């Protein structure tokens, strides 16, 4: 952890009504004496002149002083809030840097200091950047929930439960002469299953939080001429894909990135799936399957004029059987303007079924609402937290250790191996909040922040 005193502009570069210079570290009071001529009363707004060493006034504004550890970073912090012209702010930073021992902060270094001083855990620190970068009200609310500790609390609760179970297992190993066989009395198995269930719930919430932050990848797939490219154009609101009556027009992957009420959606149009002797079309079909395998959702596009079926297993069983397990599928029956079928939304064999006309736009708004719902859109903006890819990976790793531990217990009654899997699970979970985290990971996370944050 650095003991340097750092300084940076905390507001965005450019012209604005107010500009803020932030100083954090032991020399913050020295800066106050040099620039203001006094140290402001802690946590009180002080309207004063910001002066050169000669006494010439650079600007007038509000000075705020926070005595550590009662500050954002846990150190002494001075904020100078002046007028937002970039020249004025540059002059003020130049003046502050005349105090010996200061340096310009690196991106994210104020948040990193807060993390190092236990003012924030890692998920809360990341939530600051996510709140700044939020592209929707839902993303902003979820990031704020993470900043306030909702995600951290759930992870800490899991760590505590895993730790307690590990201690119980190790006690059973250390005292083998006790009359009760702790490994087979059912208590450990019940506790382990309870933890696995809770972790499953956190994983589901985290995946939803990741979609809110990073967007959902939706692949439009189906046979040639089902209307896949027309649907891409309808969702994107522009002519992104060429649409013709010729089967196999789309031979490569087409991508569109759109926002539905601010929520990011990555739409992938793919080549029509069929057996073909055309070499180029074969390559396009393989690329289509590559996209399907990494999708969050598949829109199974069906030409409604070719079949009345709504159950995807009946429409094309080979396609459904080839899909990855747990990949969500929405059946989209296209060309409702020609079939005359009702636009009702139904569920068949566990899959949502939508009737639309990609050409005329009938039913497309309902499909958009469906996609928003899948991404976690909530009109009341209550609940949920933001999550990143690294959080999902850590949760997956923790889950795998729990399942391995369960196998060691149920199949082999191997208490030592169960205890080791619980220890590995504990470490994986603790990486989320930064309890056990490499310096390389910390550097990567905080370097993506804004300077001054």
From Swiss-Prot:
Cofactor detail note: Binds 1 potassium ion per subunit.
GO process terms (BP): tRNA methylation; tRNA wobble uridine modification
Cofactor(s) needed: K(+)
InterPro entries: G_TrmE, GTP-bd, GTP-bd_TrmE_N, GTPase_MnmE, MnmE_dom2, MnmE_helical, P-loop_NTPase, Small_GTP-bd
Pfam family, one: MMR_HSR1
Binding site for (6S)-5-formyl-5,6,7,8-tetrahydrofolate: 22, 79, 119, 453
Compartments in which it is found: Cytoplasm
Residues binding Mg(2+): 229, 250
All residue ranges annotated as the TrmE-type G domain in the record: 215-376
Keywords: Cytoplasm, GTP-binding, Hydrolase, Magnesium, Metal-binding, Nucleotide-binding, Potassium, tRNA processing
Family: Belongs to the TRAFAC class TrmE-Era-EngA-EngB-Septin-like GTPase superfamily. TrmE GTPase family.
PANTHER family recorded: TRNA MODIFICATION GTPASE GTPBP3, TRNA MODIFICATION GTPASE GTPBP3, MITOCHONDRIAL
Protein's name in the database: tRNA modification GTPase MnmE
């Amino acid at each position: 952890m650095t003991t340097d005193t750092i300084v940076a502009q905390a507001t965005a570069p450019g012209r604005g009504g107010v500009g803020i210079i932030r100083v954090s570290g032991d020399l913050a009071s020295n800066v106050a004496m040099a620039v203001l001529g006094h140290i402001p009363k802690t946590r009180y707004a002080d309207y004063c002149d910001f002066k050169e060493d000669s006494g010439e006034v650079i600007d007038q504004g509000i000075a705020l002083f926070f005595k550590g550890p009662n500050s954002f970073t846990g150190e002494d912090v001075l904020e100078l809030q002046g007028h937002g012209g970039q020249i004025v702010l540059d002059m003020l930073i130049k003046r502050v840097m005349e105090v010996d021992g200061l340096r310009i902060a690196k991106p994210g270094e104020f948040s990193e200091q807060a993390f190092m001083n236990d003012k924030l855990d890692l998920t809360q620190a990341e939530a600051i950047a996510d709140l700044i970068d939020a592209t929707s009200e839902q993303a902003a609310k979820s990031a704020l929930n993470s900043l306030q500790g909702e995600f951290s609390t759930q992870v800490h609760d899991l760590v505590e439960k895993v730790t307690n179970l590990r201690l119980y297992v190790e006690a059973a190993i250390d005292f083998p002469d006790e009359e009760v066989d702790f490994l087979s009395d059912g208590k450990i198995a019940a506790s382990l299953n309870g933890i696995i269930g809770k972790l499953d719930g956190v994983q589901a919430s985290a995946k939803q939080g990741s979609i809110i932050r990073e967007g959902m990848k939706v692949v439009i797939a189906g046979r040639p001429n089902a209307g896949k490219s027309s649907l891409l154009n309808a969702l994107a609101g522009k002519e992104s894909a060429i649409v013709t009556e010729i089967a196999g027009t789309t031979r490569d992957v087409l991508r569109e990135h759109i926002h539905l009420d601010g929520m990011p959606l990555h739409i992938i149009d793919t080549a029509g799936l069929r057996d073909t002797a055309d070499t180029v079309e074969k390559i396009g079909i393989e690329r289509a399957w590559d996209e399907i395998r990494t999708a969050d959702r598949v829109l199974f596009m069906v030409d409604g004029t070719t079949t009345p079926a709504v159950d995807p297993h009946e429409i094309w069983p080979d396609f459904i059987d080839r899909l990855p397990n747990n990949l969500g599928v929405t059946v989209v029956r296209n060309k409702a303007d020609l079939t005359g079928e009702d636009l009702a939304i139904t569920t068949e064999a566990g899959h949502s079924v939508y009737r639309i006309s990609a050409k005329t736009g009938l039913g497309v708004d309902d499909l958009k609402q469906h996609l928003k719902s899948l991404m976690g859109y909530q009109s009341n903006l209550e609940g949920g937290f933001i999550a990143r890819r690294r959080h999902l990976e850590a949760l997956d790793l923790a889950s795998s250790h729990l399942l391995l531990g369960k196998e060691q217990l149920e199949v082999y009654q191997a208490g030592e191996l169960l205890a080791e899997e619980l220890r590995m699970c504990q470490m994986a979970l603790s990486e989320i909040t930064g309890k056990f985290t490499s310096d390389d990971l910390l550097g990567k996370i905080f370097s993506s922040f804004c300077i001054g944050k």
